[in-house]
Amino acid sequence: MTTRAARGEVVPPRADWPEPAPQTEAGALLTEVVLTTFRLNARVLDAAQQLAAAGGLTAAWWQVLGGVLDQPRTVAEVSRRMGVSRQGVLRIADLLVERGLAEYRTNPAHRRAQLLACTEAGYWAIRQIAVVTHPWTDRIGEQVGAADLRSLLATMQRLVKVLETADGQENSAL
């Protein structure tokens, strides 16, 4: 029986598999960080879904609406800030507008790219979420500790910056 891999190619016998280069300590640690981030992401998304329900939103709606709380932005700007696809943000933005949680405004800087802005109903939904989110983040934050969270945040921001500047350079994934 022939075994096929995820991309559809035939899986060769194990004896013919390529050997990966040995990892440095930093590379092995980064691998563990990535795998742990997958686990953390799943837990955070589960919690976000429950928290967002307090405002009548989904986690994805909360994420997109959160991208325009401080100022109106284009869908492309929101997608870049959130690190998600433009098409996904557009689909959710249209739903938010349809439900009155956001609105499209004329963009003086670009005729075709409208600005997405939060409405009073959107701000109200976010306030309802904040009422349940703050006690949750306080409780979890106290268990981890402010100093550790500050250090973690700085490291995560640095890693994001390294990965974002890696596009087209030797740091890119492929």
Question: Where in this protein do the model-derived segments appear?
Answer:
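N-terminal leader segment of winged-helix/HTH proteins
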Residues: 1-55
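Hydrophobic alpha-helical core bundles mediating ligand binding, dimerization, or RNAP-core interactions
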Residues: 30-52, 126-144, 149-163, 167
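N-terminal helix-turn-helix DNA-binding core of bacterial DNA-binding proteins
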Residues: 44-88, 99, 171-174
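Charged, amphipathic alpha-helical coiled-coil/dimerization segments
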Residues: 4, 94-154
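A general secondary-structure boundary signal
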Residues: 67-70, 76-79, 94, 148, ...
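C-terminal regulatory/oligomerization modules of transcriptional regulators
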Residues: 1-25, 147-174
